[in-house]
């Protein structure tokens, strides 16, 4: 009754590679829970549980924190488990508490660092959930000292760099004593470089404080990093005339070059890591 259609009478040969299921292993912390692609969704019994799960999700990116520091941040989140901070988006509270706690220990993140390690916070475009708005809300709810996160104080940003290149044998949480000279030197260079830009009227006043700080810190970091790679390659030295009171610890930078490179590479992956050629050329004049 029915005649076969020649064009649809096709044959296909599909070859599958050999797969031995017995040899496959699950990923660490892998579970069968459902994670929505449109929003972060955690199975939880309470808001406290949800915050802790969220904190674990975010802190794994801060690879340079040791177990004591991570435990300390969890205890800080646990201390406010009965506080209702936001009616919605409770998950996002945990990383903000972590950032404010780390800031209280003298370490802050520039906009590029925030994008590298907390892209969800950086890419939030809602006015209600923008970074500065959330910082203000959490400071008010938890009784933290009120103030802007980004201020013209460069030491805290370089303290985060110091955390990332710490020696494995450092003692105490957020301890950067061995790297303190590097923090002082980079900060002095940035302060003097910032004043040079002010005198030359090169600072973009329409930009936010965070954007200006981000540009200054990124320029200094990439310039020092590239000079360091040259001296390692040529087995030479370099100095910066802007570092008057605290000379750059070249030996320390050479010893920690692998860690420094890893940190810089994380920053380079971000969209906000943009260096002005004019600023970089101006800064290079002070390096010999």
From Swiss-Prot:
List the induction conditions.
Expressed in the early phase of the viral replicative cycle.
Statement: the UniProt record of this protein carries the keyword Transcription regulation: yes
Q: What's the superkingdom here?
A: Viruses
Q: What InterPro entries would the database entry show? A: Pox_A8 (IPR006834)
GO BP, one annotated term = DNA-templated viral transcription
Give the Pfam families listed for this entry: Pox_A8 (PF04745)
UniProt KW keywords: Activator, Early protein, Transcription, Transcription regulation
Family listed: Belongs to the orthopoxvirus OPG134 family.
Q: How does it assemble?
A: Heterodimer of a 45 kDa (A23R) and a 32 kDa (A8R) subunit to form the virus intermediate transcription factor (VITF)-3.
Q: What does this protein do?
A: Acts with RNA polymerase to initiate transcription from intermediate gene promoters.
Q: Which protein are we looking at?
A: Intermediate transcription factor 3 small subunit
Record lineage: Viruses, Varidnaviria, Bamfordvirae, Nucleocytoviricota, Pokkesviricetes
